[in-house]
Structure formats: structure tokens, C-alpha cells
């Protein structure tokens, strides 16, 4: 394995993608900065990249690199100081009966069908609601870092695992857990997404890891603004992680 001391981040190469339609802000164009070569980005280097605002999508490690827009703000939750609010406590209590099973990344038809139901129910027309098996696999099941798949099932009266309700993909970093992607049964009343974040915070606590990285907070995007509800949290501004109430901050978008 190539260690960071043998492969400092300065030796990695970074390129900017061509502009493409932004997935979160209608009418905006986005660009990404991608770290290469991907086959040399193992867990230690990847952990440092995440602390510098990068994320992972399959084999690609990237961060926003948009022209004239700084709406995507990296956000992380300090595990020791996190305090759940009333709605988060309700979500935690409501789903305590679910059984979580931590697996290596693997393809299961049941997971894929849930993914399609989620995309069609929550993000219809977003471009991912007709993903093929290959697209699903490349997006979520390919990784060279310490990644895990967590499936959540309801508990039957006899204690056995029942219907699949949610799947989370996460990366275990040197200093925390990075929430990669979560999909679930598209019941807007169930608060599955909030429960997934709470579960990952609890896992980080048990592993004695200080942070849970929630990716990018975007104030103008209802899809992403929920992340500001996990408090206290820190945001990455000018290369520094800063305690902040993200809900009061309005990043530059033009």
C-alpha cells in the first residue's frame, strides 16, 4: 500500500472538468476538480483530500470548481459535541427497531430495486431514475478506499430481519466517517435520511472517530439544506474548518 508520506498530495494531479448542468441549482453550470491518478488514492491520501473539501463518486475523487459560484460548502459534524434536536430524537426513537447490517460493497438485486424506487420517488426526472445496473455499480459499488455498505431492515415480531428499508454507503476515514450516499423507501414521513446520519454519528462515536463528513451543504437547495440541521457543525471556508451555524450563512452563487 502506498502511504501518504510516500505519496504526498503535492504529487497528485488535478484537472478541471468541462462545464455541465448543475444538479442542485437550476439554470447553473457546474465544474469539478478531479484528483488523479485514482489508483494511487488510497485511504490515507483520500482522508486528507476529504479534509480539504473533496468527495468520492465511485472511483472519482472531486470537489466543486465552479465559475463564479461558491454555493457548495463542505460540512462536518463534530461527534463529541453533537446534540440531536427534537425531530432528530423522534427519528432516532422511531427507527430503533431497525436492524443494521454492515457489509463490504456488493451488488444485490434487492438493493438495486430499492435504489430505483428511491430515485423515481424522490428525484424523478433527475437523470438517475433510470440508471442501469452498470451505472449503479460504478456510482456506488466501486471504491479503492475503506468503504462499507450498510443495509437497514425492519424487525419482524420473531426478531428476524424483515423488509429492506434503507441502504447507506459510507467511507471510514482516518479521522471520521464520510457519508457517501443513502437511498431508502420513498416515504416522506419516515425520516430515514435523518436516521441514517444519526446512525453514522453513533458509529463514529463507537469507533472513537471525531467527525462525520456530510458532503456539501447548499443553502439554496432543499435537497442539501437539511445538513445544516445537525448541530453543532463546522464548515470549510478558505481552507479552514470553522464552527458555524450554516443556516445563517448565504454563500455566493453569482
Swiss-Prot record:
Q: Which family does it belong to?
A: Belongs to the R-transferase family. Bpt subfamily.
Q: Answer yes or no on keyword Signal.
A: no
Name the UniProt record assigns to this protein: Aspartate/glutamate leucyltransferase
InterPro entries associated with the record: Acyl_CoA_acyltransferase, Asp_Glu_LeuTrfase, N-end_Aminoacyl_Trfase, N-end_Aminoacyl_Trfase_C, N-end_Aminoacyl_Trfase_N
Q: Which domain of life is it from?
A: Bacteria
What does the record give as the function of this protein? Answer: Functions in the N-end rule pathway of protein degradation where it conjugates Leu from its aminoacyl-tRNA to the N-termini of proteins containing an N-terminal aspartate or glutamate.
One GO CC annotation: cytoplasm
Reactions it catalyzes: N-terminal L-glutamyl-[protein] + L-leucyl-tRNA(Leu) = N-terminal L-leucyl-L-glutamyl-[protein] + tRNA(Leu) + H(+); N-terminal L-aspartyl-[protein] + L-leucyl-tRNA(Leu) = N-terminal L-leucyl-L-aspartyl-[protein] + tRNA(Leu) + H(+)
EC assignment: the record states: 2.3.2.29
Query: GO: which molecular function terms?
Result: arginyl-tRNA--protein transferase activity; leucyl-tRNA--protein transferase activity
Amino acid at each position: 500500500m502506498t502511504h501518504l508520506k510516500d505519496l504526498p498530495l503535492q504529487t497528485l494531479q488535478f484537472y478541471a472538468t468541462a462545464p455541465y448542468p448543475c444538479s442542485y441549482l437550476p439554470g447553473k453550470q457546474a465544474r469539478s476538480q478531479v484528483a488523479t491518478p485514482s489508483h494511487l488514492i488510497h485511504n490515507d491520501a483520500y482522508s486528507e483530500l476529504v479534509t480539504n473539501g473533496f468527495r468520492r463518486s465511485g472511483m472519482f475523487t472531486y470537489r466543486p470548481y465552479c465559475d463564479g459560484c461558491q454555493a457548495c460548502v463542505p460540512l462536518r459534524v463534530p461527534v463529541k459535541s453533537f446534540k440531536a434536536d427534537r425531530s432528530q430524537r423522534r427519528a432516532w426513537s422511531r427507527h430503533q427497531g431497525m436492524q443494521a447490517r454492515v457489509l463490504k460493497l456488493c451488488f444485490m438485486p434487492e438493493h438495486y430495486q430499492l435504489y430505483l424506487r428511491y430515485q423515481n420517488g424522490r428525484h424523478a426526472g433527475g437523470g438517475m431514475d433510470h440508471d442501469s445496473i452498470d451505472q449503479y455499480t460504478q456510482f456506488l459499488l466501486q471504491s479503492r478506499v475503506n468503504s462499507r455498505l450498510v443495509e437497514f431492515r425492519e424487525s419482524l415480531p420473531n426478531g428476524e430481519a424483515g423488509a429492506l428499508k434503507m441502504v447507506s454507503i459510507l467511507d471510514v476515514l482516518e479521522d471520521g466517517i464520510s457519508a457517501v450516499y443513502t437511498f431508502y423507501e420513498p416515504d416522506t414521513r419516515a425520516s430515514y435520511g435523518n436516521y441514517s446520519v444519526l446512525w453514522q454519528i453513533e458509529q463514529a462515536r463507537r469507533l472513537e472517530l471525531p467527525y462525520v463528513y456530510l458532503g456539501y451543504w447548499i443553502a439554496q437547495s432543499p435537497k442539501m439544506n437539511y445538513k445544516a440541521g445537525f448541530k453543532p457543525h463546522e464548515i470549510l471556508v478558505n481552507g479552514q474548518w470553522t464552527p458555524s451555524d450554516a443556516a445563517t450563512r448565504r454563500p455566493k452563487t453569482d
